[in-house]
Amino acid sequence: MNDIWWQTYGEGNCHLVLLHGWGLNAEVWHCIREELGSHFTLHLVDLPGYGRSSGFGAMTLEEMTAQVAKNAPDQAIWLGWSLGGLVASQMAFTHPERVQALVTVASSPCFSAREGWPGIKPEILGGFQQQLSDDFQRTVERFLALQTLGTETARQDARTLKSVVLAQPMPDVEVLNGGLEILKTVDLREALKNVNMPFLRLYGYLDGLVPRKIAPLLDTLWPHSTSQIMEKAAHAPFISHPAAFCQALMTLKSSL
């Protein structure tokens, strides 16, 4: 049986599980690891099939969450970025007793645009799936470029993301395709109405993948959660605005 790559870092008295986004791996947290490690015990994870967690095929969201849960501490703050936000949210929904607080970063409970719901057009996600089989490397690079578009440090941030991808083995096309399928089909809007632990949602004002318009909609749908929009950030606020990002987590921790 395969196991996922999992590293513990830091010495804080509060556990924080960090889950990366599509196509990436746990190295994406490198820029904030030192800062957070002095306040939290960090759990850095490569999701199944990504980075050093090779040997897994495509998974459903439920399967991916179950695999991550096997290694996780009994109690932790769960933070998920983008696709990782769906995994963290699914964990909060299925194992609420193990989730001290939920943090989603540039994530949506429903990434696909639906009637009355802003998001990515399903045909765009479908197009990415098609392009994966045609030109795998270029498709991943295009997706990474979209994540930093519009920020003052867009080029530099895109290079950072690319170096993270290249630092570890590339995921198989099947795994990447499965991740896009999750983004295209999953809808946790109703499920998360029943989650009642502290719940912080962080957004980038300039995010081209997760529109900030969803923030007020979810404020209404999930009144128990709080949202924060980072003004000059796009889809990777922890890379473009690490100090403000870490401060938001510190504030959350002090409120628990």
Swiss-Prot record:
UniProt keyword Calcium present: no
Q: Its Gene Ontology biological processes?
A: biotin biosynthetic process
**Which Gene Ontology CC terms are recorded?**
cytoplasm
Question: Which residues act catalytically here?
Answer: 82 (nucleophile), 207, 235
Q: Where in the cell is it found?
A: Cytoplasm
Give, as one word, the top-level EC class: hydrolase
Q: What is this protein called?
A: Pimeloyl-[acyl-carrier protein] methyl ester esterase
The gene from which this protein is expressed is: bioH
